[in-house]
């Protein structure tokens, strides 16, 4: 069975982090902190890296399911002038915005490194290099498309991601009128 375990995440200019590295335990990780300290940001960065896995599928995973870095995810730096007579406002987006990953991938626990990056405003998320998962995923897709049971050994990973944003959606509330 092919395993995918993220060992290390490195964030460069991603949301509130200028340059931060997180080493993850293969069994379980707990992020605890005050509101706004970056707990969700680390999980969203892991989701961007899972997007690299999903992006490797060309046939069976629509691109709308691939989570990318957005322009709004780029760290903002306040403009500050050395001259006290000059008033500055606003922020400047800090590019490049990059998420790097070291992970175990495959049946032989091979270590892979890859990164996803956005280089300028309104640009698309790119791979910094090639996607090391793509050859394996292409082989899986070919086996599945044959429909001759040659895919019997393929065990696809289950990927589940629930964002905290789901807590704030009002779409499922039904208005009831009494009286």
What are these regions (language model features)?
Residues 1-179:
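P-loop NTPase switch/coupling surface
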């Amino acid at each position: 069975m092919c395993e995918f375990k993220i060992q290390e995440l490195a964030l460069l200019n991603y949301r509130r982090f200028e340059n931060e590295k997180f080493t993850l335990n293969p069994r379980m990780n707990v992020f605890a902190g005050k509101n706004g300290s970056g707990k969700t940001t680390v999980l969203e960065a892991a989701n961007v890296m899972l997007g690299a896995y999903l992006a490797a599928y060309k046939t069976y995973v629509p691109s709308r399911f691939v989570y990318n870095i957005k322009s709004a995810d780029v760290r903002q730096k306040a403009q500050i002038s050395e001259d006290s007579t000059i008033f500055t406002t606003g922020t400047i987006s800090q590019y490049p915005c990059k998420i790097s990953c070291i992970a175990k991938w495959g049946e032989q626990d091979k270590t892979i490194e890859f990164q996803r990056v956005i280089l300028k405003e309104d640009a698309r998320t790119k791979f910094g290099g090639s996607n090391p998962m793509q050859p394996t995923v292409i082989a899986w897709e070919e086996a599945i498309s044959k429909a001759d049971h040659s895919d019997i050994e393929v065990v696809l990973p289950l990927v589940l991601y629930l964002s905290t944003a789901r807590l704030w959606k009002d779409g499922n509330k039904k208005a009831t009128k009494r009286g």
